[in-house]
A protein has these predicted regions:
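Conserved PDZ fold ligand-binding element
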Residues: 11-12, 203-225
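Extended hydrophobic-aromatic, low-complexity segments
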Residues: 204-206, 253, 264
Length: 264
C-alpha cells in the first residue's frame, strides 16, 4: 500500500514493500495506473518515496495541532492480501514504542489494534476525523509457539513527513552520527552512561570512554537517551558539538565533530 502525500504525485510507502523491485506500478482507487520512480528510501524508518507523473491528486488532511492519544479511534487503510482497498478499525493502544521489529533505529511507533495484515504496509493510519496520523508498517503475528493479536505498529506522520521532505530534497536522509552505546542507571545522577564506544567513531576520536557519564549536550541537560539520539541525528555532519561528561569525579567538556551516519 502507499499514501499520496502531495498533489503532484509524491507517495510514501514502506521500503520493504518496493525493495528489489525491477518496476513499480501505482494503481489509484479511480482505476488510473502509473509507473512510479523511486526517489529514495530510508533504512532506519523503513520508508520509501515514490513519484508518479500526475497532478491535482487528492491527499489526506493532516492536523499538527491534534496529538495522537491512547484510546483514540484508529482506522487502517490498505490493500491486505491484494483484496483491494479495505479499512479496519481499532484504537491507539500506545505511543512512543521503540525497539520494535528488526531495526533498533526505528523509534516512536504508534501501536494500534486496528488490523495491519500483509499488504497493508505503507498504507494510511487515520483518526476518526479523517486525518493522517501514521504510516502502517508492521505487526507482530503468529509464531510457532504463540499467537499475538492486535499488536500492530505505524510510523508517526511527523517522522514520515520529515523523511519525505529530506528524501525529496537530498535523495536520502542525512543523519548525524556519534558512535556510542548508552544507558541510564539509578546512580548516573540524571546523566547517560556510556557502555560502548564504536571504533573510529566521532565519540572515539574525541576521547569519550566506556564509563563516562554524559551530563550535557551543547549545554542541554537532563536529556533522555531518545532525546540525545534525536539531537545527534538532526545535527549536520561536520558540525562541532560540546559534550559535557563526568569521569572519575571530574567534569570535562569534550568537542565532538559529528559525522554522517554510515548507511550500514
Amino acid at each position: 500500500s502507499g499514501v499520496i502525500m502531495t498533489k503532484d504525485g509524491y507517495i510514501l510507502t514502506n521500503k520493504h514493500v518496493i525493495q528489489n523491485a525491477d518496476q513499480i506500478v501505482v494503481a489509484l482507487q479511480n482505476g488510473n495506473i502509473y509507473e512510479a520512480n523511486l526517489i529514495g528510501s530510508d533504512n532506519l524508518t523503513d520508508l520509501a518515496v515514490l513519484k508518479i507523473k500526475a497532478t491535482n491528486l487528492s491527499t489526506i488532511p493532516q492536523n499538527k495541532e491534534r496529538q495522537v492519544r491512547v484510546g483514540d479511534i484508529a482506522l487502517a487503510i490498505g490493500n491486505p492480501y491484494n483484496l483491494g482497498q479495505s479499512v479496519s478499525q481499532g484504537i491507539i493502544s500506545a505511543v512512543g514504542r521503540s525497539a520494535v521489529g528488526d531495526s533498533l533505529g526505528r523509534q516512536n511507533f504508534i501501536q494500534t489494534d486496528a488490523s495491519i495484515n500483509r499488504g497493508n504496509s505503507g498504507g494510511a493510519l487515520i483518526n476518526s476525523a479523517g486525518e493522517l496520523v501514521g504510516i502502517s508498517t508492521l505487526s507482530i503475528g503468529k509464531t510457532a509457539n504463540e499467537i499475538a493479536e492486535g499488536l500492530n505498529f505505524a510510523i508517526p506522520i511527523s517522522i514520515a513527513n520529515d523523511v519525505l521532505y529530506k528524501i525529496i530534497r537530498d535523495g536520502r536522509v542525512i543523519r548525524g552520527y556519534f558512535g556510542v552505546q548508552s544507558e541510564i542507571t539509578a546512580n548516573s545522577n540524571g546523566g547517560i552512561v556510556i557502555t560502548g564506544v564504536t571504533a573510529n567513531s566521532p565519540a572515539a576520536k574525541a576521547g569519550i570512554q566506556v564509563g563516562d557519564v554524559i551530563l550535557r549536550l551543547n549545554k542541554q541537560d537532563n536529556l533522555s537517551i531518545r532525546e540525545m539520539m534525536q539531537i545527534i541525528s538532526d545535527t549536520k555532519p561536520n558540525t562541532e558539538v560540546i559534550v559535557t561528561i563526568s569521569r572519575l569525579g571530574n567534569v570535562i567538556d569534550l568537542p565532538v565533530i559529528i559525522e554522517e551516519l554510515p548507511s550500514n
